[in-house]
Protein backbone atom coordinates (compact mmCIF):
# COMPACT_ATOMS: atom_id res chain seq x y z
CA UNK A 1 0.00 0.00 0.00
CA UNK A 2 1.20 3.50 -0.81
CA UNK A 3 0.63 5.79 2.16
CA UNK A 4 1.12 9.11 0.37
CA UNK A 5 -2.19 10.94 0.80
CA UNK A 6 -1.02 14.32 -0.45
CA UNK A 7 -2.80 16.01 -3.33
CA UNK A 8 -0.94 17.18 -6.42
CA UNK A 9 0.14 20.81 -6.31
CA UNK A 10 -1.30 21.29 -9.79
CA UNK A 11 -4.41 19.75 -11.27
CA UNK A 12 -4.05 16.28 -12.81
CA UNK A 13 -4.31 16.21 -16.58
CA UNK A 14 -7.78 14.70 -16.33
CA UNK A 15 -9.61 11.48 -15.55
CA UNK A 16 -9.19 8.13 -17.28
CA UNK A 17 -12.23 5.83 -17.06
CA UNK A 18 -11.73 2.09 -17.62
CA UNK A 19 -14.72 -0.24 -17.95
CA UNK A 20 -15.06 -3.80 -16.71
CA UNK A 21 -15.61 -7.17 -18.35
CA UNK A 22 -18.65 -7.56 -20.64
CA UNK A 23 -18.95 -3.77 -20.69
CA UNK A 24 -17.78 -1.06 -23.07
CA UNK A 25 -16.85 2.56 -22.58
CA UNK A 26 -20.53 3.48 -22.89
CA UNK A 27 -20.95 2.37 -19.28
CA UNK A 28 -19.23 5.62 -18.32
CA UNK A 29 -21.42 7.94 -20.42
CA UNK A 30 -23.15 9.54 -17.44
CA UNK A 31 -20.01 9.90 -15.34
CA UNK A 32 -18.02 11.28 -18.26
CA UNK A 33 -20.71 13.85 -19.01
CA UNK A 34 -20.82 14.90 -15.36
CA UNK A 35 -17.07 15.41 -15.22
CA UNK A 36 -16.94 17.30 -18.51
CA UNK A 37 -19.73 19.57 -17.28
CA UNK A 38 -17.31 20.59 -14.52
CA UNK A 39 -14.59 21.32 -17.03
CA UNK A 40 -12.57 18.19 -16.26
CA UNK A 41 -10.93 16.47 -19.24
CA UNK A 42 -11.98 12.83 -19.60
CA UNK A 43 -10.61 9.91 -21.58
CA UNK A 44 -12.56 6.65 -21.84
CA UNK A 45 -10.65 3.48 -22.62
CA UNK A 46 -12.10 0.78 -24.87
CA UNK A 47 -10.75 -2.63 -23.92
CA UNK A 48 -11.54 -6.08 -25.40
CA UNK A 49 -8.04 -6.42 -26.91
CA UNK A 50 -7.85 -10.13 -26.07
CA UNK A 51 -5.23 -9.95 -23.34
CA UNK A 52 -4.51 -8.09 -20.12
CA UNK A 53 -1.38 -6.60 -21.67
CA UNK A 54 -3.41 -5.47 -24.67
CA UNK A 55 -6.05 -3.89 -22.47
CA UNK A 56 -3.39 -2.07 -20.44
CA UNK A 57 -1.90 -0.76 -23.68
CA UNK A 58 -5.35 0.44 -24.78
CA UNK A 59 -5.82 2.27 -21.48
CA UNK A 60 -2.40 3.87 -21.76
CA UNK A 61 -3.24 5.00 -25.29
CA UNK A 62 -6.40 6.60 -23.93
CA UNK A 63 -4.24 8.57 -21.49
CA UNK A 64 -2.62 10.18 -24.51
CA UNK A 65 -5.97 11.80 -25.33
CA UNK A 66 -5.78 14.00 -22.24
CA UNK A 67 -4.49 17.45 -23.10
CA UNK A 68 -2.42 18.02 -19.96
CA UNK A 69 1.11 16.73 -19.59
CA UNK A 70 0.80 15.72 -15.94
CA UNK A 71 -0.36 12.44 -14.43
CA UNK A 72 -4.07 11.56 -14.47
CA UNK A 73 -6.68 10.14 -12.14
CA UNK A 74 -7.33 6.56 -13.26
CA UNK A 75 -10.64 4.93 -12.32
CA UNK A 76 -11.28 1.26 -13.05
CA UNK A 77 -14.53 -0.62 -12.58
CA UNK A 78 -14.53 -4.37 -11.92
CA UNK A 79 -11.95 -6.01 -14.25
CA UNK A 80 -10.88 -2.47 -15.17
CA UNK A 81 -9.13 -2.36 -11.81
CA UNK A 82 -6.63 -4.95 -13.04
CA UNK A 83 -6.03 -2.76 -16.07
CA UNK A 84 -5.31 0.46 -14.17
CA UNK A 85 -3.08 -1.52 -11.81
CA UNK A 86 -0.82 -2.28 -14.76
CA UNK A 87 -0.47 1.32 -15.96
CA UNK A 88 2.90 3.07 -15.59
CA UNK A 89 2.90 4.68 -12.16
CA UNK A 90 4.55 7.81 -13.49
CA UNK A 91 1.45 8.61 -15.54
CA UNK A 92 -0.96 8.26 -12.62
CA UNK A 93 -1.72 10.75 -9.84
CA UNK A 94 -4.32 8.61 -8.03
CA UNK A 95 -5.95 5.23 -8.66
CA UNK A 96 -9.66 4.71 -7.98
CA UNK A 97 -11.02 1.17 -7.75
CA UNK A 98 -14.80 1.05 -8.17
CA UNK A 99 -15.96 -2.40 -6.98
CA UNK A 100 -12.84 -3.46 -8.85
CA UNK A 101 -10.10 -6.02 -9.00
CA UNK A 102 -6.97 -4.76 -7.23
CA UNK A 103 -4.40 -7.48 -7.91
CA UNK A 104 -0.88 -7.60 -6.59
CA UNK A 105 2.05 -8.78 -8.69
CA UNK A 106 1.59 -12.43 -9.65
CA UNK A 107 -2.17 -12.48 -9.02
CA UNK A 108 -4.93 -12.97 -11.60
CA UNK A 109 -8.49 -11.69 -11.59
CA UNK A 110 -9.94 -15.18 -11.96
CA UNK A 111 -7.72 -16.51 -9.20
CA UNK A 112 -8.82 -13.76 -6.84
CA UNK A 113 -12.49 -14.46 -7.60
CA UNK A 114 -12.00 -18.21 -7.12
CA UNK A 115 -10.43 -17.65 -3.72
CA UNK A 116 -13.24 -15.40 -2.49
CA UNK A 117 -16.69 -16.25 -1.14
CA UNK A 118 -18.96 -17.11 -4.08
CA UNK A 119 -21.01 -14.37 -5.69
CA UNK A 120 -23.79 -14.66 -8.27
CA UNK A 121 -21.39 -14.01 -11.15
CA UNK A 122 -20.40 -17.54 -12.11
CA UNK A 123 -23.99 -18.74 -12.44
CA UNK A 124 -24.74 -15.85 -14.80
CA UNK A 125 -21.88 -16.53 -17.23
CA UNK A 126 -22.78 -18.36 -20.44
CA UNK A 127 -20.07 -20.07 -22.49
CA UNK A 128 -16.59 -21.51 -22.18
CA UNK A 129 -14.69 -20.10 -19.21
CA UNK A 130 -11.46 -20.45 -21.21
CA UNK A 131 -12.91 -18.92 -24.36
CA UNK A 132 -15.60 -16.34 -25.06
CA UNK A 133 -18.52 -15.77 -22.72
CA UNK A 134 -21.61 -13.64 -22.35
CA UNK A 135 -23.83 -12.78 -19.40
CA UNK A 136 -27.30 -14.34 -19.34
CA UNK A 137 -29.50 -11.35 -20.29
CA UNK A 138 -32.24 -12.48 -17.92
CA UNK A 139 -29.80 -12.40 -14.99
CA UNK A 140 -27.57 -9.51 -16.01
CA UNK A 141 -29.82 -6.79 -14.62
CA UNK A 142 -30.02 -8.11 -11.06
CA UNK A 143 -26.35 -9.11 -11.18
CA UNK A 144 -24.95 -5.72 -12.16
CA UNK A 145 -27.73 -3.17 -11.57
CA UNK A 146 -29.97 -4.36 -8.75
CA UNK A 147 -30.58 -0.81 -7.52
CA UNK A 148 -31.77 0.66 -10.82
CA UNK A 149 -35.38 0.83 -11.97
CA UNK A 150 -36.48 -1.71 -14.56
CA UNK A 151 -36.13 0.58 -17.58
CA UNK A 152 -32.65 1.83 -16.64
CA UNK A 153 -31.56 -1.70 -15.84
CA UNK A 154 -32.73 -2.95 -19.23
CA UNK A 155 -30.93 -0.10 -21.00
CA UNK A 156 -27.61 -1.02 -19.40
CA UNK A 157 -28.09 -4.72 -20.16
CA UNK A 158 -28.45 -3.98 -23.88
CA UNK A 159 -24.95 -2.47 -23.83
CA UNK A 160 -23.24 -5.65 -22.62
CA UNK A 161 -20.96 -7.47 -25.07
CA UNK A 162 -19.18 -10.86 -25.28
CA UNK A 163 -16.00 -11.18 -23.25
CA UNK A 164 -12.79 -13.07 -24.03
CA UNK A 165 -11.81 -14.71 -20.74
CA UNK A 166 -8.04 -14.91 -21.32
CA UNK A 167 -7.22 -11.56 -19.65
CA UNK A 168 -8.71 -12.81 -16.39
CA UNK A 169 -6.15 -15.61 -16.25
CA UNK A 170 -3.13 -13.39 -16.93
CA UNK A 171 -0.96 -12.49 -13.96
CA UNK A 172 -0.30 -8.90 -13.00
CA UNK A 173 3.34 -7.99 -13.63
CA UNK A 174 3.41 -4.51 -12.08
CA UNK A 175 1.15 -2.86 -9.51
CA UNK A 176 0.91 0.93 -9.69
CA UNK A 177 -0.85 1.09 -6.32
CA UNK A 178 2.45 0.29 -4.64
CA UNK A 179 3.81 3.60 -5.93
CA UNK A 180 0.75 5.87 -6.11
CA UNK A 181 -2.08 6.72 -3.69
CA UNK A 182 -5.34 4.88 -4.23
CA UNK A 183 -8.97 4.87 -3.17
CA UNK A 184 -11.06 1.70 -3.03
CA UNK A 185 -14.85 2.10 -3.31
CA UNK A 186 -16.38 -0.90 -1.55
CA UNK A 187 -19.92 -1.65 -2.75
CA UNK A 188 -21.81 -3.55 -0.06
CA UNK A 189 -24.78 -4.58 -2.27
CA UNK A 190 -22.55 -6.04 -4.99
CA UNK A 191 -23.68 -9.42 -6.38
CA UNK A 192 -20.81 -9.82 -8.86
CA UNK A 193 -17.66 -9.12 -6.83
CA UNK A 194 -18.25 -10.31 -3.28
CA UNK A 195 -17.97 -7.50 -0.70
CA UNK A 196 -15.59 -9.63 1.38
CA UNK A 197 -13.15 -9.70 -1.53
CA UNK A 198 -13.56 -5.96 -1.86
CA UNK A 199 -12.74 -5.56 1.82
CA UNK A 200 -9.52 -7.45 1.20
CA UNK A 201 -8.67 -5.07 -1.61
CA UNK A 202 -9.51 -2.15 0.65
CA UNK A 203 -6.66 -3.11 2.96
CA UNK A 204 -4.30 -2.51 0.03
CA UNK A 205 -5.61 0.96 -0.75
CA UNK A 206 -4.62 4.28 0.78
CA UNK A 207 -8.29 5.05 1.42
CA UNK A 208 -11.42 2.89 1.56
CA UNK A 209 -14.84 4.40 0.85
CA UNK A 210 -17.99 2.36 1.50
CA UNK A 211 -21.16 2.80 -0.53
CA UNK A 212 -24.41 0.87 -0.23
CA UNK A 213 -24.23 0.19 -3.95
CA UNK A 214 -24.77 -2.58 -6.44
CA UNK A 215 -21.93 -3.59 -8.77
CA UNK A 216 -22.73 -0.91 -11.34
CA UNK A 217 -21.96 2.01 -9.06
CA UNK A 218 -21.15 4.16 -12.10
CA UNK A 219 -24.91 4.12 -12.75
CA UNK A 220 -26.65 3.69 -9.39
CA UNK A 221 -24.22 6.10 -7.70
CA UNK A 222 -23.38 8.22 -10.71
CA UNK A 223 -23.42 11.53 -8.81
CA UNK A 224 -21.23 10.12 -6.04
CA UNK A 225 -18.77 8.79 -8.61
CA UNK A 226 -18.58 12.15 -10.35
CA UNK A 227 -18.09 13.96 -7.04
CA UNK A 228 -15.31 11.62 -5.92
CA UNK A 229 -13.41 11.87 -9.19
CA UNK A 230 -13.90 15.63 -9.46
CA UNK A 231 -12.50 16.13 -5.97
CA UNK A 232 -9.44 14.05 -6.77
CA UNK A 233 -8.94 15.87 -10.07
CA UNK A 234 -8.93 19.30 -8.42
CA UNK A 235 -5.58 20.92 -7.59
CA UNK A 236 -4.60 21.33 -3.97
CA UNK A 237 -5.08 24.71 -2.45
Predicted regions and their residues:
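Conserved HGGG/HGGXW glycine-rich cap/lid loop of the alpha/beta-hydrolase fold
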Residues: 10-52, 70
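Conserved acidic catalytic loop of the alpha/beta-hydrolase fold
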Residues: 48, 54-71
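Gly/Ala-rich beta-loop-alpha elbow adjacent to hydrolase catalytic centers
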Residues: 75-80, 84
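Active-site nucleophile elbow and catalytic-triad environment of alpha/beta-hydrolase enzymes
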Residues: 155-176
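Catalytic His-Asp charge-relay segment
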Residues: 179-186
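Conserved loop-alpha-helix segment in the C-terminal half of the alpha/beta-hydrolase fold
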Residues: 187-212, 216-219, 231-232
Amino acid sequence: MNTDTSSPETAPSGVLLVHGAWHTGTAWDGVAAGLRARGIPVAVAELHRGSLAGDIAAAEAALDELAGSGPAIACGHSYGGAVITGLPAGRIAHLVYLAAMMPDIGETSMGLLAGAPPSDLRACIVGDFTGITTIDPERAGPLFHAQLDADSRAEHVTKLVPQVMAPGYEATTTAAWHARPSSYVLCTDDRAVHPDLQRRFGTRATHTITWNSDHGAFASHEADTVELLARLAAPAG
